[in-house]
A protein has these predicted regions:
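Alpha-helical membrane-anchoring segments
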Residues: 1-374
């Protein structure tokens, strides 16, 4: 091969790669990625936060309200120490009040917004308001926050940019009803041409895809960093980490079950190694079309085990919600068809089978028919 031929081949390869990159970039501006996963994340996040607020309502005053030991003076000192006493200090101090009425008004609003986000009513506006209050609750309870609180804050942050109301929402039902009635969707702005509308659609798609990419990246960072921290610990390297965890009373939901797991050392060691390797390999395996479901099932089992055996149900649930970002649209469509089939099966009644006519009666009927024709 001559130098000229090699250069021509290289230019052709570079041109093909450039065209492929351009086509991918164009697709990312035209096609929203994983819209059903976005809807599932919206439902999961809104539902979990609603459960969280309702469950903690009996302790809300001590956690975030006027009765909290984290008083207003201590809160202000903490803001200054962390450098948060800037332009957004009013936002962070939203729940810092001596009035029980004001606090419970914000609390009730948070409950309502969580329910509306889960149902998908005016999703764009509600997602922003929901995120606004989640930040306020997180900062107010910064001395007692957990992994669940941090992940809910991060996902609420990313969900602001995601078009999560296109499926399984009241917004989607309203649009479908308008389409059935033949009412075309009109722009809310007076001077809004076709080119501007196309630009708006592409910008919305870019923001949606960016938000979903950030959720996926966040989940991979969580698993990757968790694996890196685990392998630095001696108990994880020798397989005894789960044994000591099961023997810790603060993380024992069912003491008998925890004792059974701890009594089977080989099983506990195997589960410890599976946990480390699955978290370490997750970022690579989750993009393989065939191995994706295997690693997601392993992570699902891991989270269920954490929620049941370690008394961390909310943390396990929010991590499962984050894993939903990796499920493709084909999975959700197949699941929807399966649900519709399961719902329609009990409603279908078997048709009543008519008994076959007797031979004598059939012969009499034929004779009568012949006689009438004669």
């Amino acid at each position: 091969m001559t130098v000229r031929a090699a250069l021509a081949l290289g230019l052709d390869s570079a041109g093909g790669l450039g065209r492929q990159v351009a086509a991918t970039a164009r697709k990312l501006t035209l096609q929203p990625l994983a819209p059903y996963s976005a809807a599932a994340i919206r439902i999961g996040l809104g539902g979990l936060y609603l459960i969280h607020l309702l469950r903690e309502s009996v302790r809300a005053d001590r956690l975030w309200g006027p009765g909290s030991p984290f008083t207003a003076d201590l809160f202000d000192q903490t803001l200054k120490a962390r450098g948060w006493d800037g332009a957004f200090s009013w936002w962070y101090s939203l729940l810092v009040t001596d009035s029980a009425l004001v606090f419970w008004a914000w609390y009730a609003l948070a409950v309502v917004l969580s329910a509306l986000l889960m149902l998908g009513w005016r999703t764009r506006v509600v997602a922003v308001l929901f995120w606004f209050l989640v930040v306020a609750f997180y900062v107010r309870g910064s001395m007692a926050n957990s992994g669940w609180a941090l992940l809910s804050l991060l996902f609420a942050n990313y969900l602001v940019f995601v078009a999560s109301g296109r499926h399984w929402s009241l917004d989607a039902r309203r649009r479908a009803r308008r389409a059935e009635e033949g009412k075309a969707a009109r722009s809310k702005f007076v001077f809004w041409g076709e080119e501007t509308e196309e630009l708006r659609r592409r910008l919305v798609t870019i923001l949606h895809n960016g938000g979903m990419a950030m959720i996926a990246l966040q989940v991979m960072v969580i698993y990757g960093s968790a694996a890196m921290y685990k392998i630095q610990g001696e108990s994880w390297r020798n397989g005894t980490a789960l044994y000591y965890t099961m023997m810790y009373d603060d993380f024992s939901t069912f003491p008998e079950l925890s004792a059974w797991v701890a009594s089977h050392g080989t099983f506990a060691a195997l589960m410890a190694y599976v946990t480390v390797f699955s978290q370490m390999l997750f970022p690579a395996l989750v993009f393989n079309r065939r191995l994706k479901y295997c690693i997601l099932v392993v992570m699902l089992a891991t989270h269920i085990g954490i929620g049941v055996l370690m008394a961390l149900p909310m943390f396990s649930a929010i991590t499962i919600v984050g894993d939903l970002v990796f499920l493709p649209t084909t999975f959700w469509l197949a699941a929807s068809r399966l649900v519709r089939t399961a719902r329609a099966a009990p409603e279908e009644k078997p048709e009543a089978s008519l008994p076959p006519p007797r031979e004598g009666a059939d012969g009499q009927a034929k004779g009568a028919e012949v006689g009438s024709s004669a």
